[in-house]
Amino acid sequence: MAKYDNQKQLKCSFCGKTQDQVKRLVAGPGVYICDECIELCQEIINEEFEEDMDMGIGELPKPKEIKEFLDQYVIGQEKAKKALAVAVYNHYKRINSRIKPDDVELQKSNILLLGPTGSGKTLLAQTLAKLLNVPFAIADATSLTEAGYVGEDVENILLKLIQAADYDIEKAEKGIIYIDEIDKIARKSENPSITRDVSGEGVQQALLKILEGTIANVPPQGGRKHPHQEFIQIDTTNILFICGGAFEGIEKIIESRIGKKSLGFGAEVQSRKEKDLSEILSHIMPQDLLKFGMIPEFIGRVPIVVTLDPLSKDDLVRILTEPKNALTKQYEKLFELDGVKLEFDKKALGLIADMALERKTGARGLRAILEEIMLDVMYEIPSSDNIEKCIITEETVLKKAPPTLVYSDAQKAKKKIKKTESVS
């Protein structure tokens, strides 16, 4: 408390009240502040902090807006996009809401994406993070092992997210983590074994806490944890985990369950070939995942299951041409920088889609196929003069003929003059 000076009565530099009008007067270099002004300043700071907390990730887009954004980058998968849009909206709405302790508790809902290789699982997760402007990290479940064994600890997944957020922990705590190949950590058999399953059930057990929400200790340099190192602490309660996997063979499990129920007098039994794979996957239930090898506790922490359809030829052609960052648009831009217009004819695009289907790589394999086709073209074109247009035809894709080249008027005139001279 500031000492009283008989010659000059002390006053608060903010409100002007004298020392005898307030409980406390704190002195600084040439200034004074009373307890009432300190309390008022504290209230202002608290209000601003609460406003910042309310803002969360900014203005949260509605489910329809989320789906419209996904439509720009992801072709097909309408049902999956709708389900993801609702799930993500509800997740971030839960984070942004200020719920009283005695109110209804909104539980966290992580997502499981189930679909064939190259159907768009990773792209969906990446695009969501891009729209919401939150940190995003991808982890491969196959590299994870239970603590104490050779491989990565599950906490290293969180380190990737922290790095994506430039070590801003508060920002990372609202990020998205995509765990790929989650089906590869399925339990090796339905019956518990004497030998420890360190890369299967053990990893599922290790993931449980971070999926549900916990204060995790993350080694700043990655690698294994040891007692004498410092840790980064991160709360995983509001991190959205999206797990993806092909779950090859799960359709047989679903079929056997549905088949048994449908059997009876006059029941029509269809063979697997007659059934559509996407239709079978749409009937997935938690018990099917359990039989596949996922443990009950893991299934409980990933309650939203979204199935993706296998991509058709038409889907692959659309993927090549329609999205904002479509592969053909990327090649067109590269050629445009050399002053050449690039075109793909419809038959060529159809053939590229057929090749991807044959390789069973889905949309992921399109880039590799295009690189094979375009290598010689991209090698020759920059060194050739006066080329106006390059057309990739069906024969080019089959490597039976080079692309059709259209030359500029100046080059055509030059060729015409040479031809006339040779005739004369």
UniProtKB/Swiss-Prot annotation:
InterPro entries: AAA+_ATPase, ATP-dep_Clp_protease_ClpX, ATPase_AAA_core, Clp_ATPase_C, Clp_protease_ATP-bd_su_ClpX, ClpX_bact, P-loop_NTPase, Znf_CppX_C4. PANTHER family: ATP-DEPENDENT CLP PROTEASE ATP-BINDING SUBUNIT CLPX-LIKE, MITOCHONDRIAL, ATP-DEPENDENT CLP PROTEASE ATP-BINDING SUBUNIT CLPX-LIKE, MITOCHONDRIAL-RELATED. ATP binds at P116, T117, G118, S119, G120, K121, T122, L123. One of its GO terms (molecular function) is unfolded protein binding. It comes from Thermoanaerobacter pseudethanolicus (strain ATCC 33223 / 39E). Zn(2+) binds at C12, C15, C34, C37. Gene3D superfamilies: 1.10.8.60, ClpX chaperone, C4-type zinc finger domain, P-loop containing nucleotide triphosphate hydrolases. Residues 1-53 form the ClpX-type ZB domain. Keywords: ATP-binding, Chaperone, Metal-binding, Nucleotide-binding, Zinc. Belongs to the ClpX chaperone family. This is ATP-dependent Clp protease ATP-binding subunit ClpX. Component of the ClpX-ClpP complex. Forms a hexameric ring that, in the presence of ATP, binds to fourteen ClpP subunits assembled into a disk-like structure with a central cavity, resembling the structure of eukaryotic proteasomes. ATP-dependent specificity component of the Clp protease. It directs the protease to specific substrates. Can perform chaperone functions in the absence of ClpP.
